Design a protein with these regions (language model features):
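C-terminal-of-GTPase-core extension/linker across diverse P-loop GTPases
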Residues: 1-153, 158-164
C-alpha cells in the first residue's frame, strides 16, 4: 500500500516526521509513505527543470522530488521496473514486471517483436548518457548482445533485433 500524504506548505519542514508517523501507524510489509505538498509540486511541474531546482533550494526542499519518490515506491510495491529504447531523435521508457526476459520486454513494445525476437543489444542508461549515442557505445564495445534468456534490468537501454 502506498500512502501519499498531502501536507500544507507550513508542514514542509516536518515532512520526514510526518512520514515516520504514518509509517509507524500503518507499518507492515508492502507499505510505503511519501509526504508531499501537492500545491508546490503542481507549481514545480510547470517550471523548467533548472528553475524548479532553484525554487526547491530556495524553499529548503530536497533536490529529489517527493513525487518522483512516490513513483519509485509505487513501482517497487508493484514489482515493476523500466527499460528504455533510444533512437536518433527519441528515448522512451517502457514498464515491465521485474524479472521479465528480453522477449517479454520486447512484447511490451509490440507483440511482433516478441514473436520474432532474435537478440537484444543492451547498455546501461548512465553509459549511454556518458557516450552520447548508441553508435558511440557500440564503437567503444559497451553494447552487449543478449539472447532470449536475458533478464532485463531496471534502466537498461535495449535495442531489439527481430525477424518475422
Amino acid at each position: 500500500m502506498l500512502l501519499v500524504v498531502n501536507i500544507g506548505e507550513s508542514q514542509l519542514a516536518d515532512a520526514e516526521a510526518i512520514e515516520r508517523e504514518f509509517a509507524s501507524k500503518h507499518a507492515g510489509p508492502g507499505v510505503a509513505v511519501v509526504a508531499l505538498c501537492a500545491k508546490i509540486e503542481a507549481e514545480l511541474a510547470t517550471m523548467e527543470p533548472a528553475d524548479a531546482l532553484e525554487f526547491r533550494r530556495d524553499l529548503g526542499l530536497p533536490e529529489a522530488s517527493p513525487l518522483d519518490r512516490a513513483i519509485r515506491e509505487a513501482y517497487a510495491l508493484l514489482d515493476l521496473q523500466s527499460f528504455l529504447t533510444a533512437g536518433d531523435d527519441e528515448c522512451r521508457a517502457w514498464t515491465v514486471r521485474r524479472g521479465s526476459s528480453a522477449p517479454e520486454a520486447a512484447g511490451k513494445i509490440h507483440s511482433d517483436l516478441e514473436k520474432g525476437f532474435i537478440r537484444a543489444e543492451v547498455a546501461r542508461w548512465d553509459e549511454l548518457v556518458e557516450a552520447g549515442s548508441l553508435a558511440e557505445l557500440k564503437k567503444r564495445g559497451r553494447l552487449h548482445v543478449e539472447g532470449k534468456t536475458y533478464i532485463v534490468q531496471d534502466g537498461d537501454v535495449v535495442n531489439i533485433l527481430f525477424n518475422l
